[in-house]
Amino acid sequence: MYCQTYGFNATEYSRTIPGHQFSEFVVRYALSLRCETNCSSRDIVTAIKKLAELTFGLVDNIPSYNTIDNWVRKCGLDEINHASQAFKDGDYAVIQDECMMIGSEKLLPVMAVPAKHQGRPLQLSDVKVVRFHVRSGWDAQTVSEALKESAESMGKAPSYVITDNDGKMRKAVALSSYTWHRDISHTLAMFMERTYMEDSDFQNFSNDVATCKRQNCMKEVAYLQSPSQRSKARFMNLSESIEWADRMLNTYHRLTKREREVFSFLPMHSSFIEEMKDMVSCIHYIESQMKQQGLSKVTVAVCERHVCTTIMRGNDRMRRVGQLILDYLAKESQLLKDGEVLNNSSDIIESMFGMFKYIQSPNKLNGVTTLILHLPVRLAFADGTASRNYNVKERLCKIKIQDVTLWRDENLIENQVVKRIWTLKSA
């Protein structure tokens, strides 16, 4: 039977994949649910059981949750093995970040993205995982070695490397003799932190907001409290708190007497809130230009003009941040060729590992496991059409579970939970 709407042969999909007990339809359905939804493997088993009841024979066998995860692991390993194919006809850039610490293990992923800006912000479907590196700790030398290994697996060196402002990342890129572009969001947040972190006005405002929230979190006015801030990298999400403060000031005269008493500290900080509002607005403008239009001499000039006409006309603190931004833009411009439009944002890495944190074990002793191989498959499915075009049969026939085990032994650290089980079992 041929489905004209989707362009596939249903009879072909119902056949068992060679060397497996399940049809291509079941495998494809399970992969789609695992990679395109938030379904757990156990939820998918339940969904396939219900599908078997409703389709009267289309589904013969029901896979276990571990079987489903093994399918994803195999496909993920194949994605890593063939990452270079996505850039065989074009240049690529590397995004690298020591982004996760699970237990005592630090994960250093190396991701490849198109070197040329695509006329839009980077999307998950643009990213290919080149390597996953895991160690108990990283320094500039080991990060540099990881970069070189990744370049060897890709068959050519990256056009440039995007990282945050971590000192060891900067040194590692220099040791590897690659061009380094600093992530725009981390860099601007760093400039804000340098200027405002120890500033008395900022500290007083932050303390008043925190005290108000702590004292009134369970009272009637709790619905008006400020949004929660990240404990780390707080200067990367200042906008929500500043927007809240600005809205509260604008609506202050409409609050009840009790509410005005609770938030009476806000009018005292009105000039500082207005200053921060202007700072956040300028930073968002620069980030939007760089992410939407790409890093080029044109966007650098546009951003420089905007800084000069906004925050450089403000007070001493604003001008200090403005000068840091102008110096940063000038250095980035020196690395560019005429007409060159590049990426300089690593925001995509936050989205990627937000997905992984959802499926990883809450037990920190597990560290980084082969579940990390789910990530390359989720990226492959990110464009929404892969569920129809993804060659499941070829990947499962090509990659064996022994290959996954070998990859684990070569790339991951010994699982502490397994070590604990075997140690206590032998007691």
Pin down the residues of each PLM region:
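Basic, low-complexity segments
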Residues: 1-16
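RNase H-like nuclease fold core
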Residues: 16-22, 26, 32, 36, ...
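A general alpha-helix detector
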Residues: 29-30, 355
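Short alpha-helical "recognition helix" segments of helix-turn-helix
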Residues: 44
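Acidic/histidine-rich catalytic cores and adjacent linkers
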Residues: 163-175, 211-427
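Glycine- and acidic-residue-rich phosphate-binding/metal-coordinating active-site segment common to enzymes
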Residues: 187-212
